């Protein structure tokens, strides 16, 4: 595929709607990981997401006649707000089809820009079908969230800003991947200007459609999708974005929910800003890459792609961040039901912090406990596991068991 995006990105003017966001060094994260880690702050956009770039670039290139007919989009969040704000600036009608399960705060954000919201179905696939019906009836223009040349061009302006703002060598740029629009725009521009810079995509475990598609050399459809990083949770990537990624993306990384939560905490500690899970994917990817490849003294850029966090998720993020940093391990342990048994267990734990403790009566002879223990890393966790085994306490390491972390820790009695 010929790279036709470089010139169009150079000439794209998205700044009537989007902000030129800063590229900031993450002081604490860089020090901890012994690399120069920079954050492209797309969370500081007017709609708290990079999506405004692509939506506005698509819409400002529509004819007056098309703008008069209005635009339509389907989205559960960030793209919806981008289209709504772009429509407000361009003074055209906008209809956004959103799932019935969309949080009220996101619906209100879209409506605050004057867009009409249509609630339909439970999934984005159902919303897409409904949007096409409305489009045909009203003659409006569909603004695709990622699989569109002008949308991809708009997202690519991020890459242009990165190179303009940082003149020294960059080893890799990390991007979150959902449908593939963001990484396509960045990759196409970077490979045309600085092809030596690696482009690395990051997906959430259970929502890795691009990773699987690149391995299969064709677009795959996931049977189901993990919704924790909902802003990047899609069953299938775009046709155009897949072709671009095949040509220009160097590597894909998949991270789990705990790693995402830890990345949210990392960014908060450096910036006092809270990213949404999809917005922190790139940071989680940088950390995973450094650990896996044991590199230091490199320069990495991570795109902070969004900050439309649902407030009720903060407790979950805080709870899981320590596991993501390998600072907490979760065990199920069987102890004798007799006086002094818990004291003996605590002696085995030593001076380590017990972060949580749940007791369940099992029988007259034994009891089951669910315990969180502070550790320095998972190597220490393995040593503790062996120590508990030698004491015949039948320990089970549940640190990476999603069902246990979501449900068992809340059982009592």
Regions found by a protein language model. Name each.
Residues 1-413:
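PLP-dependent amino-acid enzyme catalytic core
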């Amino acid at each position: 595929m010929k790279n036709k995006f470089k010139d169009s990105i150079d000439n794209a003017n998205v700044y009537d709607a989007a902000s030129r966001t800063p590229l900031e060094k993450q002081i604490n994260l860089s020090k901890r990981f012994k690399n120069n880690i920079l954050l492209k702050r797309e969370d500081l956009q007017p709609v708290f997401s990079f999506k405004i770039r692509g939506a506005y670039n698509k819409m400002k290139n529509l004819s007056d006649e098309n703008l008069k007919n209005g635009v339509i989009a389907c989205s559960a969040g960030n793209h919806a707000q981008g289209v709504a704000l772009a429509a407000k600036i361009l003074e055209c009608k906008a209809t956004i089809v959103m799932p019935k399960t969309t949080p009220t705060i996101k619906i209100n954000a879209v409506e605050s820009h004057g867009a009409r919201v249509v609630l339909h179905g439970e999934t984005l696939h159902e919303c897409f079908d409904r949007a096409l019906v409305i489009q045909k009836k009203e003659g409006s223009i569909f603004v695709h969230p990622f699989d569109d040349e002008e949308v991809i061009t708009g997202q690519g302006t991020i890459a242009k800003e990165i190179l303009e703002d940082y003149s020294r060598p960059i080893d890799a740029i990390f991007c979150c991947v959902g449908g593939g629009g963001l990484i396509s725009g960045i990759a196409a521009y970077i490979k045309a200007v600085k092809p030596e810079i690696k482009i690395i995509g990051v997906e959430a475990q259970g929502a890795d459609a691009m990773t699987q598609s690149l391995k299969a050399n064709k677009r795959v459809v996931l049977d189901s999708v993990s919704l924790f990083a909902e802003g990047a949770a899609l069953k299938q990537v775009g046709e155009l974005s897949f072709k671009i990624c095949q040509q220009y993306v160097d590597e894909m990384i998949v991270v789990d929910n705990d790693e995402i939560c830890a990345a949210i905490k990392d960014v908060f500690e450096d910036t006092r800003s809270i990213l949404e899970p999809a917005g922190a994917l790139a940071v989680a990817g940088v950390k995973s890459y450094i650990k896996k490849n044991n590199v230091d003294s490199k320069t990495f850029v991570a795109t902070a792609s969004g900050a439309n966090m649902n407030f009720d998720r903060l407790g979950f993020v805080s709870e899981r961040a320590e596991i993501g940093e390998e600072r907490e391990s979760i065990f199920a342990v069987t102890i004798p039901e007799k006086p002094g048994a818990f004291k003996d267990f605590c002696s085995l734990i030593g001076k380590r912090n017990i972060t949580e403790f749940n007791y369940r009566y099992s029988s007259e002879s034994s009891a089951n406990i669910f315990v969180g223990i502070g550790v320095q890393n998972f190597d220490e966790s393995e040593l503790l596991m062996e120590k508990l085994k030698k004491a015949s306490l039948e320990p089970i390491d549940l640190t990476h068991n999603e069902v246990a972390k979501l449900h068992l820790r809340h059982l009592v009695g």
